[in-house]
Amino acid sequence: MTRRACDLCPLEAFCKPATLNVQRTSKHRPAEEMRSDKESQSIRVTIVQASPQPSDLASGLRKALALIEEAAEHGAQLICFAETFLPGYPAWLDFCPGAALWNHAPVKEVFAGLRANSVVVPGNETQALGEAAARLRVGIVMGISERVRDAPGHGTLFNSLLYFAEDGRLVNHHRKLIPTYSERMVWGQGDAAGLRIAKVHNVNFGGAICWEHWMPLTRQHLHNAGEQIHIAAWPTVHEMHQIASRHYAFEGRCFVLAAGQIMKASDLPIALTPLEALDPQTLIERGGSAVIAPDGRYLAGPVFDEEIILYATLDLQEIERESMTMDVSGHYSRPDIFRLQVTASDRGDDISGK
């Protein structure tokens, strides 16, 4: 058998995808009674890699709630979803060149559909997610396209992450700081009000959305906050996104849950024509979800091209061991030379746990 160069590398374990802790939605190991506490210093985490329902928020929410229930039944304590899973990432921005045409009636209709199916915070969807979190005693991180209803900016959508604690409280609400490239046609700029950590089962967790992982000061701010678990929300976790997620884990000495979703060409709006002819079954968002350790190695995944639930039990003491060599907010930093100032004004959200 021919061996690849990486098979001979002493860092082989770091480069290769993990083969453990990957479970399909139809098959699960017996549930494990895992609850994080000071004695066990562990937490059971889950990434739900699934197909959204781009034109039907209600159906997408029902699917998400069913998957949350399933994951909780199998021991999950923290459950996360991909970028804008509700109602689904607007992949037509990447595949349909007509999306950028000025005053183009079809694209305005598609945008109106995205707006109608975006989540109001607080609203019926956040109530349902909070109730599920409280009933199942799990933390939930959900990527949404957010619509402002009764406040300034009511004509603007945001790319957001919602964080629910195990008691059902919405403990953080982050809006993506800068929509990336074509995303600026549908989403507005966010703020730093949600750029902070929250707690689930007494563990510090935070997150960032897509290309925020290439904003060095954003990373430093979250590292300074003391993340133990970081949710990296992507539409799909392709090679460069894998690199960014693993770099974040290594740099921040934290666990990273890199979450992607599955979308087919058939999910593109009929009103817009793709740049090239695509078979309806062609995958345009391929998943790639993975759980990454504080030293950058894979604990679960990455898994591509299928709907799946990934599980991993995280040993939080691993953070303590890895911090011996790197602490970018402590012994591997120079605050006497560099200073970071963050303007995080209060957005006015009624969010507990600040």
Q: At which residue positions do the language-model features occur?
A:
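Cysteine-centered motifs
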Residues: 6-9, 15
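N-terminal glycine-/serine-/threonine-rich phosphate-binding loop
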Residues: 35-78
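C-terminal beta-strand edge segments of enzyme domains
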Residues: 261-354
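Active-site catalytic loop in hydrolytic enzyme cores
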Residues: 120-121, 125-131, 146-228, 234-247, ...
